[in-house]
């Protein structure tokens, strides 16, 4: 029996990928600042390349952070500890070029437009959005984590690849690596099997490709991917170029915010374009994307839809979102209008409301900077909680 199959592919990268190094450094600096100054304004950008890291951006804070020390410690944790790896946390140069946040932006963020116009602190205690923009959140019931299977498995494989390196199960592995998973979906849009796995890992020079292929299957793929999803037709491409010795920042420059699809839903849902890392929670690029995921996940967990995408949009200096849009792709049990009204009732989607609702003024961000911001099974993140399920169910009944 044949059916109309559909293939979908997502990718992830390891913590040693140059762009992910940059994300982790930016978020490590953010976390270090938030430890002492939860109200700091941070927009921290990192560039890494051979022998150096450049930290730039705008930071307004009352605390002091030894930025070069944070950079070196973060890169050491990732595993770049020897010059022969092409990047050494101890001998690399760290350059900084930090300014304060623009007072024009601060005016809109510190006191929302509604408050400045109406001068009614009792009515509106809100932080204005730090920028205009649109953000998306998504959830699906195809996995227990409410994530699309391709990106979920890509993250699991990338994390496992780093774990076997750090645990010295495969001592010849180096920090840089990428994973790509292609999943086959049936006519009911349910995942049925894995069609292709692509995995590239940096390695020591004196190792044979055949051994890498065997070891990766034995220690990374088979312990991670459910056996039921693999079959004789599944294709494996492991280090398909044949050699991956030069990697990390020596092989490619890395920048904060260059892996926004890896960070979110692997291309399965739309993206507003703004990155997360290095930004404090007054930046709606980050906080509103987390809130949109929180909303979508609770809608799907409440069984009001099988899949759900939420769009939020903001104007700089204005607290209330200018629009809330929900798409259930024909799987909704109630109308999308009803869902929007229920969301307006039970979720405070003003920037200050999001920060309070999700308790975002804490140093929780570095752990999100590799292996995805959503659907994590190894860390507890506030936007993944399912505490609005019953409220949503009751709201649409009424």
Curated annotation (Swiss-Prot):
Cofactor: Mg(2+); K(+)
UniProt EC number: 2.5.1.6
EC main group: transferase
Reaction catalysed by this enzyme: L-methionine + ATP + H2O = S-adenosyl-L-methionine + phosphate + diphosphate
Metal-binding is among the record's keywords: yes
Binding site for ATP: 17, 176-178, 243-244, 252, 258-259, 279
Region of interest (Flexible loop), residue spans: 101-111
Protein localization: Cytoplasm
Family of this protein: Belongs to the AdoMet synthase family.
Protein name, per record: S-adenosylmethionine synthase
Protein's organism: Staphylococcus saprophyticus subsp. saprophyticus (strain ATCC 15305 / DSM 20229 / NCIMB 8711 / NCTC 7292 / S-41)
Record gene name: metK
